[in-house]
Amino acid sequence: MKFLTTGLLATAALAAAQEQQVLQAEDGHGQAPQRDASIFDETLQKFQSSLEDGISHFWSEMKTNFKDYLPLISLPKKHTRRPDSEWDHVVRGADIESVWVQGADGEKRREIDGKLHNYDLRVKAVDPSKLGVDPGVKQYSGYLDDNDADKHLFYWFFESRNDPKNDPVVLWLNGGPGCSSLTGLFLELGPATIDKNLKVVSNPYSWNSNASVIFLDQPVNVGFSYSGSSVSDTVAAGKDVYALLTLFFKQFPEYASQDFHISGESYAGHYIPVFAAEILSHKNTNINLKSALIGNGLTDPLTQYPQYRPMACGEGGYPAVLDQGTCRSMDNSLERCLSLIETCYSSESAWVCVPAAMYCNSAILAPYQQTGMNPYDVRTKCEDMASLCYPQLNAITEWLNQESVMQALGVEVQSYESCNSGINRDFLFHGDWMKPYHRLVPSVLEKIPVLIYAGDADFICNWLGNLAWTDALEWPGHKKFAEAKLEDLKIVNNKDKGKKIGQVKSSGNFTFMRIFGAGHMVPLNQPEASLEFFNRWLGGEWH
């Protein structure tokens, strides 16, 4: 079995062969597509001979148990592309790439850096009255098209409720990999949610209360996005995000002049260091990146995986979920897990990073999964595994699949799903899961502040692990940050002034927050507290 998360599709038991069930991709008739087993065998044999014995063993297990179930790429979505004439705006990346200006030194240079000629951006002005989502607030939806690779990323933009001419712009990314950011929109921090009767309910604590927010379905084939190809690693996805922002701000220069922040949760702990580094690598850009925020992220597996046992066994501030025997078993498995992750860090090759993910997720994550407790909140049982332990997702999915909704948004796929297991599988089997993307954070910290926040009831990307990797990160401010003490985080902006909502430590450009009483999705469990620290962060506090 494997458990799906709104932020992390933890393939928790891929290596536990006897008890596993792998979610199979189906063709249009409900049958698993045929695989070319001979090619699969030859590929594994070619590389197995050069691997260490332990790693080779895991590839042998995968070859035996999973070759008939795992496609090498996720299947494309059925879609119908709308003609450009049906869109309110179409921005051509080639037009942007062709603009040259003269610098102060007299030399000619491109106005905006980056490979953009293959990208277009299609924009639809959404009529809020048709959907009932934040009536009166300006909204846009559409697609970023990579015409060379046949990739089409869906986005939905909400202007700030407060002062859109001056408020910052924020990009929100859910994780997975393979989960739609519309989950974040309707379940967590967006302007509305959907009740069990499919009625739109306003969210007074939406993050667009004082900021304009872009919700992006990425990588391709997630949510309303689609493609004839696939993206199976974080670095490739970063190029698409840079193009989206560049073309969006070119179409809407009124937002380009404002501060921009990139935010997300869970597997976005992989995405955001890469995406921020990609943006910052361009000297001439129209993206005014000011900070990055990661909530309950997976960023440094080598440092975070040792904290799963303490969190599950009563050392994270909540009662133990696992018995002492299971806790000892996790301890006994940890050394081998960390050895595999270290090898992955050294090589960054899929042929060693995949076995690390398979073994560690089976030995370290699966014991918790088998209890039936919610992996995103140690306080509760998992109500419905099919809906990722949150039945509210069923109503959100049903609402988004209505023809009237898809028509209003300009959607080009036939259906919406909150998470795509095929994308998760692609990233896993390309070795992305265990790669050391935290190594990019120091270079990001040189230029912008970074906030790592964590709901303290989450298991899957728990606060202990996030505190551990931020304390361990090697950067010029490492010593001062590691020595800084956690201090009370209190509400300062409303009637609950003085109420403790968590703990915070900060030094230089780096800040860590523990949010009390929140699981994996902080804005869902603590909406008031999340908007409090979000607004204060955007306002410049702690940096």
Curated annotation (Swiss-Prot):
GO molecular function, one term: serine-type carboxypeptidase activity
Domain of life: Eukaryota
Signal peptide (from-to): 1-17
Record keyword Membrane present: no
GO biological process: proteolysis
Keyword Hydrolase listed: yes
Enzyme class: hydrolase
Catalyzed reactions per annotation: Release of a C-terminal amino acid with broad specificity
Xref: SUPFAM superfamilies: alpha/beta-Hydrolases (SSF53474)
Active site: S266, D458, H520
Subcellular location: Vacuole
Any one annotated GO CC term: fungal-type vacuole
Propeptide position ranges: 18-124
Protein EC: 3.4.16.5
Pfam families, alphabetized: Peptidase_S10
Keywords: Carboxypeptidase, Disulfide bond, Glycoprotein, Hydrolase, Protease, Signal, Vacuole, Zymogen
Functional summary from the UniProt entry: Vacuolar carboxypeptidase involved in degradation of small peptides. Digests preferentially peptides containing an aliphatic or hydrophobic residue in P1' position, as well as methionine, leucine or phenylalanine in P1 position of ester substrate.
Family: Belongs to the peptidase S10 family.
This protein's name: Carboxypeptidase Y homolog A
Native species: Arthroderma benhamiae (strain ATCC MYA-4681 / CBS 112371) (Trichophyton mentagrophytes)
Name of the coding gene: CPYA
